[in-house]
């Protein structure tokens, strides 16, 4: 594998979004165990909201929020992780397409705008009781 420039950026709640905008590829490794079944896939949703293609562990709620090969890749074995990361490194157009697909997924399914009718219905139902 060719050398890829990397930079470690410590997490900072004040600069997180700005820092993420510098990413070209996101990584979301979680252990495939019972504890991880309680995870919410928020990291994957964050990557998608910002338009970052990513590789995530093929486990838990990741199956519900993303499609393998559309917004990013899912991997379980070391070989799958390696192959997925290399594909994203080598294909700028794929990264762009996946980033756009991720952003569209968040806008269509998870945004306030797309969920407003559901919220409104709940509030109207509660208010009428």
Where is each model-derived feature located?
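Short loop/helix-cap segments at secondary-structure boundaries that form the rim of catalytic
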Residues: 1-4, 65-67
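Active-site donor-binding acidic/aromatic loop of nucleotide-activated sugar
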Residues: 3-12, 19
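Nucleotide-sugar-dependent
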Residues: 13-46, 56-64
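Nucleotide-sugar donor-binding loop of glycosyltransferases
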Residues: 29-32, 51, 57-59, 69, ...
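Conserved acidic donor-binding segment of nucleotide-sugar-dependent glycosyltransferases
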Residues: 66-79, 87-93
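A short, well-ordered alpha-helix in the C-terminal region of glycosyltransferases
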Residues: 94-109, 118-121
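C-terminal alpha-helical cap of glycosyltransferases
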Residues: 112-129
């Amino acid at each position: 594998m060719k050398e890829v420039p990397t930079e470690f950026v410590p997490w900072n709640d004040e600069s997180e979004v700005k820092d993420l905008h510098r990413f070209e590829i996101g990584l979301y490794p979680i252990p495939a165990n019972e504890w991880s079944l309680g995870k919410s896939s928020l990291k994957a949703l964050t990557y998608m909201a910002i338009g970052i293609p990513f590789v995530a562990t093929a486990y838990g709620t990741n199956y519900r929020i993303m499609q393998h090969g559309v917004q990013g890749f899912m991997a379980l074995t070391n070989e799958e992780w390696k192959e997925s990361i290399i594909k994203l490194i080598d294909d700028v157009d794929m990264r762009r397409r996946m980033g756009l697909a991720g952003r569209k997924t968040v806008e269509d399914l998870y945004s306030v705008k797309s969920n407003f009718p559901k919220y409104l219905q709940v509030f109207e139902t509660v208010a009428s009781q």
